[in-house]
Design a protein with these regions (language model features):
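Hydrophobic h-region of N-terminal signal peptides that target proteins for export
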Residues: 12-21
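Hydrophobic small-molecule pocket/channel-lining residues, especially in calycin-type beta-barrels
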Residues: 22-153
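Bacterial N-terminal signal peptides that target proteins for export
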Residues: 1-10
Length: 153
């Protein structure tokens, strides 16, 4: 009887460990905005995502040209400096997981000013990429949150 109980306990622990170690979703691909971004110039109409066991690389193209940001999949901080109009903006990036949602945080420092953009990525049942982004209102108001839907292109 004791062996059965120990065996059952080992089985339960193994199942729980297996569920915890499930693979995270892959966001790799070319994506095109399918929801109306409104007047928010910070939402890119297209983006390319490359994801492997070490890095997530997001390349967006929009009003401000091409922008590439890399994130370390292990959760450590990374650097993604941005050259803009002859100036360098220092950017620190970090990736974290909240269940099957990926949380991307990018902090930018420029001219003594610092601001943070946080994005929560998830995949819908139909394979669409859902992004909820929160950034500062650069007009002096509180944070601005936008929700965007992308389809693979």
């Amino acid at each position: 009887m004791k062996r059965l109980s120990i065996g059952s306990a080992v089985l339960v622990v193994s199942l729980i460990a297996g569920l915890a170690a499930q693979a995270k979703p892959s966001f790799t691909g070319s994506w095109k905005l399918s929801s109306d971004p409104g007047a928010d110039a910070f939402i890119s109409p297209t983006m390319a995502v490359a994801q492997d066991e070490k890095l997530l690389t997001v390349t967006t193209t929009g009003q401000f040209g091409e922008l590439k940001t890399t994130y370390n999949v292990d959760g450590t901080e990374g650097k993604s400096p941005l050259d803009f109009n002859g100036n360098t903006i220092d950017r620190t990036s970090k990736l974290a997981w909240d269940g099957d949602k990926m949380v991307l945080t990018t902090t930018s420092d420029f001219g003594g000013q610092s601001f943070e953009v946080k994005q929560v990525w998830s995949l819908a049942a139909d394979g669409s990429l859902l992004i909820e982004a929160t950034r500062p209102d650069f007009q002096g108001g509180g944070p601005v949150t936008t929700k965007s839907t992308y389809k693979k292109s």
